[in-house]
Each structure stands twice: as C-alpha cells, then as structure tokens.
Amino acid sequence: DKDEKADLGNNPGENGQSDSLNLLVINKVEKTAQILQISRDSMIDIDIYDVTGNKLMTEDGQIALQYAYGDGEERSCQLTAGKVSELLYGVDVDSYLSLTLDGLVAATDAVGGITVTVPEDYTAIDPSFEKGATITLNGDLAEKYVRKRDIEVLDSNNQRMERQSQFMEALIEKMQGIDDKTEYLSLYQNLDEYMTTNLTAEELEELADYKISEDIVKVPGEIISKDGHAQYLVDNKELKKIVLNLFYKLL
C-alpha cells in the first residue's frame, strides 16, 4: 500500500499494509491456475511484534495489518503468507510476490497499458471512469483504478477488489502474451527494484505456460462496520468448501 518499499528499521506496525491479496493456486499436472482473492479487511488473529522481532501478543485485526509488523520486504511477505495459510486451514503457501504501487505503474507501462471496461460509475475517482467506458490505463491512471476508493463507503474495498480482479486478469493476459524470453527477463529486471519475491525470473516465466482461469474465486463473507472501520467476516463454512475444491482431490 506504499509507493515505495518501506524503510528498514521502522517501528513495527508502520511498514505498510497489504492493499491487495491474491493467491495463485496452480495445478502442475494439468498446467492450470486459479486466482483466489482475499479481502484485505478479512478478520484474523494478527501477531504483534516488538522492534527486535519478538512476538508480544495476538489480537483480532484485518489481515492487511500483518504486513506492517515485518520489515516492509521479505519478513512482511513471510508473515502475510503465514496468515493466508492460517486463513485457509493450514494450506501451504510456497511462494510470495509483493509489488509496490510504483511497480504497478512500471509494469503497466512496460506492457503498453491495460484496456478495461469500467463496470460501474467511478467518475468520483477520475472523470474518465464512466460506467461502460472502455479505456486504456497507463501507469498513473492504472494506480487510480486499482487503489483509489471512498473510505466513507463501507463496501468501497469490495468495489475496488472488483476493479483489481479485472485489472489483474488483463495484466496477466498481456504478460502471458510475451513470447520473447529476453523481453520477459528484461521486464523482470525492470521491476526488480519494486518487487519482493522468493521466485526466480525463470520460475515466473514458467507461469506463462499455465492457463489461468478468468473466473476469480473470492473468499466468501460479509462486510460490517465496527469502531469506524470495515471488517470482513469470513464465512468459514463456505470457505472450507472452496479450500477442499481448490487444494484437494477425491480418491
């Protein structure tokens, strides 16, 4: 949720938050993949750490907050991945990739812009975001499209998640269209300063071989307001069905 990577050494709880959380579930046998979108406001037990990295306590909070108790880079990603695993009943999260907003701008410009059809009237964010309008987002406009929201509206994050899903599908499609390995590695190198990941360039390139479903699955639940903040209460019964369907196979 920051334009740049956090400065190491910041106080715990001040190293940014996860603005958008998505888990790519891959089937290595069938070479298919499915995106599971997780609301940043999903309530879970957040681990609180001191400046030396010692765990102090656990308290109820939005999953986006867990990132803030790391270092803004690898540690933040590891902590967040752990909470995603916890949310999904212990399913292993093997890899992570975090991209700053500056990186989003760079990625969008690198692929020549992203074309979307605006699903609702978002002219309050930008005059060009009229309902039904088909527009090509450049870097700065792309940031507005996936980041901006009216925090006074309780459901604004869910609305933003819809735009993020739409944008992500279009970006993945563009990146999968890159056939030249040299061009792909060049894109990876250009994004390196904005990105934190434990994946190699070669591993990321391999994802181009997977057919990614256009239907993004969302963690089910309902949004409520409490103490002036949005809270997304996960429907654990329905989530368990999704986890069983995505990660397990009947024998």
What is each residue range found by the language model?
Residues 1-251:
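Non-catalytic, solvent-exposed segments at the cell envelope interface
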